[in-house]
């Protein structure tokens, strides 16, 4: 049963569906624990990252890592990427953008950003929404 719930959650594609899913969970199991709420926010974070051209997102030890899509040059010239760069470079003590290197130290072409002092999934979601809308922090 748990696996089918996770699969259904993974298949959702918009906020309305997510809210309907949450309502069904509450109807079935009662009030959701904080961990379940955070899981719903993980889905929201994944959607937001897709919209921003972020292929992978990790939050570990209060550090948010955003791995950008390997894509054509259009993305690197986009308004969204420009907002990310502006945010990162205006906070050099907290953020940086770098390029991955292979075992021999050669660039792989994969770029990523790290942002320190992000404590929760909710915090990451709020921060990325602010970057996306150009409202900073």
Question: Where are the model-predicted features located?
Answer:
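Accessory helical-bundle/CTD segments and flexible terminal tails appended to RecA-like ATPase motors
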Residues: 1-137
């Amino acid at each position: 049963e748990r696996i089918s719930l996770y699969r259904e959650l993974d298949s959702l594609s918009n906020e309305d569906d997510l809210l309907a899913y949450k309502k069904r969970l509450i109807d079935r199991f009662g009030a959701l624990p904080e961990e379940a709420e955070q899981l719903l926010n993980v889905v929201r974070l994944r959607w937001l990252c897709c919209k921003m051209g972020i292929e992978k997102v990790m939050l570990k030890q209060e550090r948010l890592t955003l791995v950008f899509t390997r894509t054509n040059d259009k993305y690197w010239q986009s308004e969204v990427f420009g907002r990310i760069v502006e945010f990162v470079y205006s906070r050099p003590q907290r953020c940086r953008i770098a390029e991955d290197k292979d075992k021999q130290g050669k660039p792989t072409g994969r770029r990523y950003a790290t942002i320190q002092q992000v404590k929760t999934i909710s915090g990451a979601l709020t921060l990325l929404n602010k970057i996306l809308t150009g409202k900073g922090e």
